[in-house]
């Protein structure tokens, strides 16, 4: 087993209905490998997998749901074993909320409390709170989510567990060809098939928007300049609002017929325009599929 002082492990637990799902999604956005409902008895084996992953699992968030006293024995043993290792220090994040808030959340979702499947949720909440007393005492961080919206809980987790780099809002700008389908992960799609097409100029047909001759041709038209002005205006207006809403990344897709000339040119342009302010990744999905529209 290889030691790695850079390995981070966060164990997420707490009251049912306090926000564990939102918390796991937040860690996933921060690049953590996330596992929900991991039985505590499997924790030692999972730690071995982390150590042997050669850096592929150096940030892990585990959602552990403790529904019975027998689970505690396995968890305490695993945590005590971890305390003897120097290469990994687990952080326990305990999510809590007022009883009244938890009851309201269960009523809103029409779900039964796991410890009171056929009874009143308050009875299940009381039983769970008693079970989790020791776990809460051992937690590094306790978050009361009673007055937090999901977005606010995410912001707290990002603030507590991310580096400045990880907090960066990422913008992915990609070109594509409509003939190959719209990217399924696109948040915003722009169609530039109305622009003059270099495909019909024989010597440009085998080239792409990465070639200066093609990009110069596409960018020389007045309609291209007007479109780029409006597009950059719109995108720069929207990005801060998307970021404020808690999105960790935005995928902007620009398409032409074959994804080789016009869309590539405009994707490169938009990427360069946004890079001074944002973490931007530019890609061209279909540029190598076929040289020609």
From Swiss-Prot:
Pfam families: PapZ_C, RapZ-like_N. This is Nucleotide-binding protein BCAH187_A5316. GTP binds at residues 65-68. GO terms for molecular function: ATP binding; GTP binding. Keywords: ATP-binding, GTP-binding, Nucleotide-binding. ATP binds at residues 14-21. NCBIfam families: PRK05416.1. Displays ATPase and GTPase activities. The keyword Magnesium does not apply. InterPro entries: P-loop_NTPase, RapZ-like, RapZ-like_N, RapZ_C. It comes from the Bacteria. Belongs to the RapZ-like family.
């Amino acid at each position: 087993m290889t030691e790695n002082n850079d390995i981070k492990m966060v164990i997420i637990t707490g009251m049912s209905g306090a926000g564990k799902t939102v918390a796991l999604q937040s860690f996933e956005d921060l690049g953590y490998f996330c596992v929900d409902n991991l039985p505590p008895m499997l924790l030692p084996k999972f730690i071995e997998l982390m150590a042997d992953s050669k850096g592929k699992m150096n940030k892990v968030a585990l959602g552990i749901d403790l529904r019975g006293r027998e689970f505690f024995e396995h968890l305490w043993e695993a945590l005590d074993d971890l305390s003897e290792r120097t290469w990994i220090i687990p952080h326990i994040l305990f999510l809590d909320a007022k009883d009244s808030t938890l009851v309201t959340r269960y009523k809103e979702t029409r779900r039964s409390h796991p410890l009171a499947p056929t009874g009143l949720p308050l009875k299940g909440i009381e039983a769970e709170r008693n079970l989790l007393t020791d776990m809460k005492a051992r937690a590094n961080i306790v978050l009361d989510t009673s007055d937090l919206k999901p977005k606010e809980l995410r912001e707290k987790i990002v603030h507590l567990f991310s580096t400045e780099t990880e907090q960066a809002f990422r913008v992915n700008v990609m070109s594509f060809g409509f003939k190959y389908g719209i990217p399924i992960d696109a948040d915003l799609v722009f169609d530039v098939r109305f622009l003059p097409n270099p495909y019909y100029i024989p010597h440009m047909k085998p080239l792409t928007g990465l070639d200066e001759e093609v990009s110069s041709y596409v960018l020389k038209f007045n309609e291209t300049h007007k479109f780029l002005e409006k597009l950059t205006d719109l995108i720069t207006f929207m990005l801060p609002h998307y970021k404020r809403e808690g999105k960790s990344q935005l995928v902007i897709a620009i398409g032409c017929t074959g994804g080789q000339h016009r869309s590539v040119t405009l994707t490169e342009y938009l990427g360069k325009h946004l890079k001074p302010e944002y973490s931007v990744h530019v890609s061209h999905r279909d540029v190598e599929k076929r040289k020609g529209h």
